[in-house]
Amino acid sequence: MSAIDGLPPLRDVIKRHDLAARKSLGQNFLLDLNLTARIARAAGPLDDVTVVEIGPGPGGLTRALLATGARRVIAIERDERALGALEEIAAHYPGRLEIVCADAMEFDPRPLLGGARARIVANLPYNIATPLLIGWLCAEPWPPWYDMMVLMFQREVAQRIVACEDDDAYGRLAVLSNWRCDTGMLFDIAPSAFVPQPKVTSSVVRLVPRSAPEPCNRAALEQVAAAAFGQRRKMLRQSLKALGVDPARLAAAAGIDPTRRAETVPVSGFVAMANELIDIRDTKNTP
């Protein structure tokens, strides 16, 4: 991409700005600009789109997003060492890159969007990837402030996001992700593409918010999933006792056989049980 955007190779940028990746920040820099371009294309078309990027580091994906045509990129970077490299990209793309030095776990980008929707595209720092995703999936109101997420995770986490019932990776994260979004695994990236090399393969995932998920109380859904998968090898009539209601009654009222295990219940089944949980609690609280 250096030949396309006229900016120096990423290895030179890292050396010049003393940007050795820090394990404490979950940093693994993706230096293959062909792969960053592939991620940007997977999030496209980006014309007239505002992209929110988390943890841009030396800016490989940032450059790809801008070169692919993103109207505006809001890059949220906690590591002050990376700001100089990002400012060079901003100078190359005047008015299109906004750099925010902040912790993505604490920063809310919505005030910068002026009421418009954005697209989240990021090689997420490994140590905060799952909490960030859960926060975005729990956004209120719904549909959320973003129209798509294209994100890189450790492959094991990516599998937990896109899993369906009867998959080994199916669990609480899959229930929440697939209740609110259409999810899909796009492609893998080998450890050799990163500096430093992680010990595991990474995967790029796309999540597109559903405009109208099945009606459900999110907190109740999370409670049911947590109870069921907290003892995933046990039958629902046992694992759901943690909810403080008759587990067999709860499952049966939702049309689910209480002898089933959590890993065999589809997302729609968890939604039904969450709705029944609300009804049972409301009935108990009615004088």
Curated annotation (Swiss-Prot):
It comes from the Bacteria. It is found in: Cytoplasm. S-adenosyl-L-methionine binds at N28, L30, G55, E77, D103, N123. Its EC number is 2.1.1.182. It catalyses: adenosine(1518)/adenosine(1519) in 16S rRNA + 4 S-adenosyl-L-methionine = N(6)-dimethyladenosine(1518)/N(6)-dimethyladenosine(1519) in 16S rRNA + 4 S-adenosyl-L-homocysteine + 4 H(+). This is Ribosomal RNA small subunit methyltransferase A. Keywords: Cytoplasm, Methyltransferase, RNA-binding, rRNA processing, S-adenosyl-L-methionine, Transferase. Its main location: cytoplasm. SMART domains: rADc. GO terms for cellular component: cytosol. Belongs to the class I-like SAM-binding methyltransferase superfamily. rRNA adenine N(6)-methyltransferase family. RsmA subfamily. The gene is rsmA. Specifically dimethylates two adjacent adenosines (A1518 and A1519) in the loop of a conserved hairpin near the 3'-end of 16S rRNA in the 30S particle. May play a critical role in biogenesis of 30S subunits. InterPro entries: KsgA/Erm, rRNA_Ade_diMease-like_C, rRNA_Ade_Mease_Trfase_CS, rRNA_Ade_methylase_Trfase_N, rRNA_adenine_dimethylase, SAM-dependent_MTases_sf. It is an enzyme of class 2 (transferase). GO terms for molecular function: 16S rRNA (adenine(1518)-N(6)/adenine(1519)-N(6))-dimethyltransferase activity; RNA binding. Pfam families: RrnaAD (PF00398).
